[in-house]
Amino acid sequence: MESDKSMACLNRILMNKMMFVEDKISTLKMVADYYQKEVKYDFDAVESPREAPVFRCTCRFLGYTIMTQGIGKKNPKQEAARQMLLLLSGDVETNPGPVQSRPVYYRYNDPRYTRLEKAIERRDDKIKTLIKELRRQIKNRKIYSQGMFDKLTKQISDGIKDGVGSEQMNGNLTRICDFLENTLPGLQANIQATVIDTTDKYVSLKEDIMKIVLVILLVRLLMVWKKYRASLCVILIFIFKFYGFDQKLIDLIMDLKNKIFSQGALEDTVEEVVYHPWFHTCGKIIFAVMAFLTIKKIPGKQDWDSYITRLDRIPKSIEGAKKITDYCSEYFNIANDQIKMMVLGKTKEELQRANGLYGEIQAWAQEVRQYLELDQRNKIDLDTETANRVEQLWIKGLKFKSEPLLSKEMSALVHTTLLPAKQLYEYVSCSPVKGGGPRMRPICLWLVGESGVGKTEMVYPLCIDVLREMGMIKKDDFHHQVYGRQVETEFWDGYKGQKIVIYDDAFQKKDDKTAANPEIFEVIRSCNTFPQHLHMAALHDKNTFSAAELLLYTTNDYNVKLESITFPDAFFNRMGDMAYKVSPKKEYGIETEKGNSGKTYLKLDKSKLDKTKAIDLSVYEFQKIVRDEKSDAGWIDSGSPLDYEDFAKLVCSKWKEAKQSSMNKLKFLEEYAIRAQVGSEENSEYGDCIDFVDDIAKRLQKGETLEEIEFDYASDPEMFTQYYHFKSTIKPASRWQKYKDRMDICLSDCKTYLAKKYEEIKKILAEHPILTILGMIGVALSALAMYYWFSKSLDPVEAEVAPSGDAKTVRLPRKLVEIGASGDVKTQKIVKPVVETEWHRNNKGEIEISCDECGMHRMSAFNNMTDEEFDNCTYEDLNKDQKRELAQWSTKDSWLGRFFLSRDRKNKVGIWAEVGQSGDVKTNKAQIKRVEAGAEELVTVALTQGCSDDAAHNLMIDVFQKNTYRMSYFRGDKRYQLGNCTFVRGWSFIMPYHFVQAVFARRLPPNTIISLSQQMSEDLMQIPLSHFFSAGVDNFYLTDNCVRLPFKNGDFRDCVMVNLHSRMCTPHRDLVRHFILTSDQGKLKGSFSGAMATFHVNNMGLYRVYNWLNAVRPCDKKIEIFHPEDGFEYPEESYIQRDCYEYNAPTRTGDCGSIIGLYNKYLERKIIGMHIAGNDAEEHGYACPLTQECLETAFSALVNKNKKNISSQFYYEIPNMVDPLGDSSVPEGKFYALGKSSIRVGQAVNSSIIPSRIYGKLSVPTMKPALLKPTILNNKVHNPLLSGLKKCGVDTAVLSDDEVLSASQDVCRVMLNQYNKNLNKTKYQRILTYEEAIRGTQDDEFMCAINRTTSPGFPYAQMKRNAPGKQQWMGFGEEFDFTSNYALALRKDVEQLIEDCASGKISNVIFVDTLKDERRDIAKVNVGKTRVFSAGPQHFVVAFRQYFLPFAAWLMHNRISNEVAVGTNVYSSDWERIAKRLKTKGSHVIAGDFGNFDGSLVAQILWAIFWEIFVVWLKQFIDIENSEGKRILCICLGLWSHLVHSVHIYEDNVYMWTHSQPSGNPFTVIINCLYNSIIMRLSWIRVMEKFQPRLKSMKWFNEYVALITYGDDNVLNIDAKVVEWFNQINISEVMTEMRHEYTDEAKTGDIVKSRKLEDIFFLKRKFRFSPELQRHVAPLKIEVIYEMLNWSRRSIDPDEILMSNIETAFREVVYHGKEEYDKLRSAVLALKVPQELPENPQILTYNQYLHDIEYLADPLYDF
């Protein structure tokens, strides 16, 4: 019997009830192989009366027997196999019914068409049915977690054979489907195109060859006949024809003709043609051609050589041609002027003056005529810009009037137009917009504050902010748009309509009844809507009105005493509306006594200001005050204080409201005035009757009065009736009508004049035919020749409709502009604000459009359609106006938009087609068949849709892009993809919990590496599986680094948070603030558009993908999510998830873990959850909901699990000067790009090291200065900086937590022991003050002052300073500066850094990568190896010394005994102590040399140093459980983070290291020593685990090994009992496993297990016992001593450095013994003075040097 599990797998294989001919037998064979059974077939011939043979097949399998018969060509074996499969699958229905097929088309009853169509149908149906059925078999109808686990079934479990065959078959069928659907049609089309193209080329080539042969024969004949010119002409004609120049010429002429006709050029006047710039250019070309032709006629030989020779003489070929062209251009200009004078009838002077003036005059007159209309004049009262333009018309007219040489007609036009232009000018002067009517009530802003708070200083920035709101944004507007009013001067001299008036120190004059303060009453007049007529001293400035819109008063006292006005509230009502008390913030103020009153006030302390800012606006705060007569002060505070930014926004908002209110009132008054009139100006009270006008005028002239005339008219009833009608209808001609009539006459005369000139020109051209022909031909030829020059600017853009692959029609590359959102920063489109409009039906049923933002209100273009037409119309039925309205104004939220969308969804008609993908579900891009149309131009322009939410889009392409990773792991050599994870804060990321379940189901070993990758950065982070969970037999348990996220009811979400702190993981930016709040979830009603950032994998590697999500909506029901059917055993087949988000999206396997963001500009926070599942069949996706509250709860849970998880609260923030969207270039390796800096750093390119005067005299140089700039090496540009940085981005090892913990705890024990009994431990268990961190404690040699001569770091080094190094901020010489502005600014930066670290913010510390200017071996310099030094910023150095320097001093005071040699004086007895320690375990010693030590540092060990060593030290004097202790721990953690994951800059590229520590930090050597001790203990553990597991603990390491470290140098003394295993060879091997290069220090090439103490070097010094001193001494390498004499440094006197080096060399060579001393002494004394040495050096005797060493009697020995 087969197992139930096997039968279930078989049933899944046999679910498909229909198999095809090709697969029947093979499928049954596969089933048989699965059951390890055989299928037996028996064939028998059956007697049949038919002519065709009949066979019977008997199929036996698993006890079943099937018999089938086959006739003729039918295969009974296949039929038997099919029926056997049907029997096994339980299908008893052998006839499923008829199959629907395509109907046959009618083709004129021709049987051939019928047979052809049937054959095509059979072929198509066969392919379609095959593809359809194959896809149906493998189609998945359940919801699966998309974590890429369903692709792992084929290779993993040998014991589980269930479903292997089916999965292989499904995979093959999938590939067949993809091939049939994609590859095959393309191959067929390409083959057909290739064949056709090849055939065409062959035919074309054949024709071309025939043509060439014929031309060659013809030319040969002409040459035989000696017709050389004719043969040359034939060749030229053939070339012209062969390359299609003839057709091109015809096309150019036709295009030019079409464009001329289309542009209406024939309607241009002759004058316009004459003045056209092309006419000028064409004429020059014609004259040049004529000149060249004339040159050819110079007497002489006519052959080409002679022609070129002669052309060379007039003068020098090309130069001569250029000069001739210039001369011809001058002559043409003269001729052109003569033609103009002849055509226009002007003299030369008139032509020069009137050149182009007539057109300007006519345009000016037409513009004046335009503003005479009533509707245009009304605009003057509403629009300042229109008023200014009308004013300029009068000024321009005066300019035209001054022209003395205008024609009579033009002069008449100017004089006629001047009077109405003047009247318009006067109308503008009296217009309300110029101050003569109702005006805007100005905003009265009253700023009150004590003297010295800085009121005046912040006034101009405030004015600039208000002017910007007014639209005056030029940089100098604040100069002339702000008027300073001094009331004591009485007059407003200099006022030119400024919008802002400032009363500085207002109301200083006492107000008295007899001597009133004019400011008081001016406040009442100014703060009003009535026109304020200003008192001006100059006569021409009279009639000036105030146009101020903001009145700004500053004063010291808000209790203004009023005596001269009867109603004081009129003053306070105006001033109290915007009254604010100004004061500095507390942190920027200083308490100052107010006179002798005993009261104090806060005065601005200028020493606390930011010296980098000219005006620091952040120091002010503004408190609103309101009038309250009940209070003692008369005023009380209202609301909370505002900072400057909020205050400026408030003032601008108030101005905007007042401005809008003023415009509304003015508009109302104008409308009210119109309604008050009896009729319009055109329908006034009088009619037109010339008889009554003449009669009345004559009788009035005779002396009759109007009353007498009317009395006479009344005596005749019929006449009075006519007079009454005349009086009722006629109106007297207004002055504007007179102006219009007169100007119409003048314009008519002008047109008549121009027409007359046009006829004269025609007559002249007719009388001069030669000139006419020359001009026309010249223009035609010139236009043809220049057409090609202008074609690029004239031709419309042509584009290929779709890419065809044809090189002739390929689309040219263009600058890209992003229409939708692709995620690429380089093509990101700036989104313009969207104007929201509203469609609604009024009471009459008409559609109206209204927009509150722009004030638009009008009827819709759809009102001309009936209801039936409106309901049934399609987009093609709309007219031009309706389409424009629909495209420009209808949004998805408008009534009209919703109507069309809902109706067209039912009718399946798409109105909107999205050009790019914006994420809007209603505008998804329609799929369109693409057809190549040759050179067809794109006529229809698609309306594009911009990004609906710019904030969400920037979040996607910036933060999501850098915080999202793809997770994967290796099994063997194959990589398996898991899914996505996203870092939400610092080192903490979230991922679906089913990832953990799936990994556990695969039974991966704990040391399996989970890799986190991004596009172009694979395996950027590597974490062992043991970091996530510990596995049991049937279950697993999350470690302290992970926590699940629960719902409120206790159920868990499909989400787990993981903290990767202490791993090779960089801190990330904070995403938590972008997640929605729980209170926001209630707002997510309906459906939204969204997006998610994910990764896909293809043959090219990993690449980022943005999926746009449609109809994102809450899903309140529970959903069942199935684990993939991948052959692994899960704890459960499925799990339930409730309260999800559902959306429509083509998600795919591997998208799980992607963050879901909404595109909704009204939603402040955009992230709502994480993708956890999808349904491939229905294209539905599901997301786990996430909020800020649940994430914060998870962070707290992590901290409760383990105190080290306090690191989960930390995050990185990009500094302000860094643009995260900038295209940053990072060195090769594993680095994390951050962006581009606005501040660029430079590099030193010239070395300060120079050869000395005795270079090469004493020894052959073995070193030279390192390269400091890019250099060409081996024909390639070598950048030494990037080459050196590449070493810091190498892969590092992933170590076991247990072994690292064991080693680090043992190192902690050694380091914290007190070996120096003279030390007071409490002196070092404290935090230094700021002053101590800079100048030192002054009582400890290892807590000395900071080095102030070195670089201050970034960005201080880029600031302007007057002293080198850090002295600008810390002082010079013996004095330390703590009070200057620079010193205070530095202190502020240090305090801010410490505060940031305390709050969990890692930011604003950037190390500068620079090349180290030093001597290196010549071989290394020749290959470009230069060491890189990373200088830290000084504010970080100070802060780090505050918290870590005492611990470093403790280690140095206990040196040597604690394995650390830092602080050792190599000239003192310290070297003897080191030698003794290295002999305690015997004579076996090794001294290894690390290669690329800094670049190989493992972040795991660096964090172990912090947590297992330093924090243990910190706990001895700080209680980290209370708030203050927790704060100090956070500060230290933040400062340490700046080292382990340091941020660097080179040029302007900012990036982060994933591990290592920068060489320029103040703790470099100490960290390297501690690291060295830990890594050597790890080597012991691994070596002993291989050879002697019994001895792997730290007890035996300390028993058998004595270690000394100094940075990356170390020496080990190993006991003889273990040296067989723990030696140089084995240590190097295990170091390689840990990604460290550790070789023999001697570099002799001989591999030895150990050496003797006297054979090794430590710090480039040997161990030599001195019989004279009776102790071990430290002789420097002899070659180093001699090499130092070959070099000096650039300085004022390089010889002084040389003499100092000679003295040092003798003090060093003494340690080598008397023989080496004598050798050096003889060599130096042999040098000539002054040729080789500047002076005779001082050389002591050998014994004197020994004496100095014994007593350390030289500054050199003060190490």
Swiss-Prot record:
The record marks G97, P98, Q701, K702, E818, I819, L901, S902, Q1209, F1210 as: Cleavage. It catalyses: RNA(n) + a ribonucleoside 5'-triphosphate = RNA(n+1) + diphosphate. Residues 950-1191 form the Peptidase C3 domain. Keywords: ATP-binding, Coiled coil, Helicase, Host-virus interaction, Hydrolase, Inhibition of host innate immune response by virus, Nucleotide-binding, Nucleotidyltransferase, Protease, RNA-binding, RNA-directed RNA polymerase, Suppressor of RNA silencing, Thiol protease, Transferase, Viral immunoevasion, Viral RNA replication. Residues 421-595 form the SF3 helicase domain. Protein 1A might be expressed through a ribosomal skip from one codon to the next without formation of a peptide bond. It comes from the Viruses. The keyword Ribonucleoprotein does not apply. Residues 113-140 form a coiled coil. CDD domains: Dicistroviridae_RdRp (cd23194), DSRM_SF (cd00048). The keyword Membrane does not apply. One of its GO terms (molecular function) is lncRNA binding. ATP binds at G449, E450, S451, G452, V453, G454, K455, T456. The active site is at H994 (for picornain 3c-like protease activity), D1054 (for picornain 3c-like protease activity), C1152 (for picornain 3c-like protease activity). One of its GO terms (biological process) is proteolysis. Residues 23-90 form the DRBM domain. Transmembrane segments: none annotated. One of its GO terms (cellular component) is host cell nucleus. Pfam families: Peptidase_C3G, RdRP_1, RNA_helicase. Its EC number is 3.4.22.-, 2.7.7.48. Protein 1A functions as a suppressor of RNA-mediated gene silencing, an antiviral defense mechanism of insect cells. Binds to long dsRNA and to a lesser extent, to siRNA. RNA-directed RNA polymerase replicates genomic and antigenomic RNA. This is Replicase polyprotein.
